[in-house]
């Protein structure tokens, strides 16, 4: 079978959806072949070594991503594919697929958390603008999909809270990531080369975009307040800072004289990323909204416990497996999260690490899950004229 992925950008710094595309392609069944159409500039450096066939139709001039090239390309190429996966919402990509497929080729939509009601409450003015697009366009993109894919059972009912029109064919896709390959000692060294200040320090790891949605301010503030309770524990904040927020976050750390214990290595990739997980004590994500959290699954794959807010949709099931501590997404909740970790005996931390590895193997190993997701099209009716 031939599968087409449609996504606004494959830039790793844009967040999780681009990684989803890569994983689904890499671990699809052997008899599947995949291509990607994207709105990226053909000269974008991150497209040079993708390892799969990419059709970049950019550059584009707006966040909506309109280009007349996309609809024309989809119509000209649709009959080469057995199914289409649309990644994300609120962009021209979904509308173009809806128009181009016209009942000829089944498509599914991966919202990637973009229907979470968090956005309605956090950005009310943007939500009203989305309503204007929802009724005539986005809702019908979902209604026309063979399936709308949600990555957790928690995400599915939450998606129905954002808009009162919410009839579609939903399916909970078993998602996750792939375990690291290579030598963990060499990967640790790659990380220490990127972040030498923690070579001989214990640390907690945040890995993701430096963004308000991720609760970075909660984590920094909580760490500042608890820094004296464990003077040998540091914090690593690893990720791209597209909003230039780091300077503001560092001010409170400097005021408390602990700025030298918070480290900012930027975005980590490859061995350095895996080395960060292996070298850490635990992974922390006090997010205000997290549909799945690939970094959470990556931490589990490395046998690291995870300290999560209750707004991470996978938090309850990971806590049930004994691999997570969970608290509410406030400064006080994040303080309790760190306090609970600091107060755990070493033996209990090690037991949580073993449970983390087992949790990953049983729930989030994409080597099997990817086959289930792309295999959906084998049950879809053929609708070509």
Identify the meaning behind each predicted range.
Residues 4, 177, 197-214, 220-223, ...:
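Conserved donor-binding/catalytic core segment of Leloir-type glycosyltransferases
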Residues 37-43, 177, 207, 234-248, ...:
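Glycosyltransferase donor-sugar binding loop
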Residues 89, 288:
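Aromatic "clamp/platform" in nucleotide-sugar-dependent glycosyltransferases that forms part
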Residues 115, 130-148:
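Membrane-proximal helix-turn-helix segments that form the acceptor-binding/catalytic region
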Residues 156-178:
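Helix-loop-beta element that forms the nucleotide-linked donor phosphate-binding surface
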Residues 247-268:
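Nucleotide-activated donor-binding/catalytic signature segment of Leloir-type glycosyltransferases, i.e.
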Residues 305-309:
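Short hydrophobic beta-strand element within catalytic cores of glycosyltransferases
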Residues 324-332, 340-346:
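Conserved acidic donor-binding segment of nucleotide-sugar-dependent glycosyltransferases
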């Amino acid at each position: 079978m031939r599968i087409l992925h449609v996504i606004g950008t494959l830039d790793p710094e844009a967040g999780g959806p681009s990684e989803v595309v890569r994983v689904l392609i890499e671990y699809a069944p052997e008899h599947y072949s995949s291509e990607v159409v994207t709105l990226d500039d053909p000269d974008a450096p991150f497209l040079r070594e993708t390892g799969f066939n990419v059709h970049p139709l950019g550059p584009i001039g707006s966040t909506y991503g309109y280009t007349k090239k996309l609809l024309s390309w989809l119509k000209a190429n649709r009959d080469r594919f057995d199914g289409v996966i649309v990644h994300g919402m609120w962009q021209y990509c979904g509308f173009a697929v809806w128009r181009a497929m016209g009942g000829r080729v089944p498509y599914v939509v991966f919202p990637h958390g973009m229907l979470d009601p968090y956005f309605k409450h956090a950005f009310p003015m943007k939500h009203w603008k989305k309503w204007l697009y929802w009724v005539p366009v986005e809702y019908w993109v979902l209604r026309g999909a063979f399936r709308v894919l949600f990555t957790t059972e928690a995400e599915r009912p939450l998606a129905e809270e954002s808009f009162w029109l919410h009839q579609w064919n939903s399916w909970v896709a078993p998602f996750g990531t792939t375990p690291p390959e290579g030598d963990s000692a060499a990967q640790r060294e790659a990380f220490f080369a990127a972040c030498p200040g923690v070579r001989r320090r214990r640390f907690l790891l945040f890995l993701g975009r430096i963004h308000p949605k991720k609760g970075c301010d909660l984590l920094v503030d909580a760490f500042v307040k608890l820094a004296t309770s464990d003077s040998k524990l540091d914090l690593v904040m690893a990720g791209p800072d597209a909003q230039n927020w780091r300077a503001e976050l560092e001010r409170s750390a400097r005021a408390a004289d602990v700025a030298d214990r918070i480290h900012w290595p930027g975005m980590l990739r490859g061995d350095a990323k895996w080395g960060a997980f292996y070298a850490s004590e635990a992974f922390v994500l006090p997010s205000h909204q997290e549909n799945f959290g690939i970094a959470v699954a990556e931490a589990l794959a490395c046998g690291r416990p995870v300290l999560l807010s209750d707004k991470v949709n996978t938090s309850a099931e990971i806590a049930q497996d004994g691999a997570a501590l969970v608290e509410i997404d406030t400064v006080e909740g994040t303080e309790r999260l760190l306090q609970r970790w600091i107060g755990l005996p070493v033996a209990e931390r090690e037991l949580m690490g073993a449970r983390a590895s087992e949790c990953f193997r049983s729930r989030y190993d994409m080597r099997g899950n990817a086959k289930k997701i792309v295999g959906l099209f084998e049950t879809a009716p053929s609708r070509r004229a």
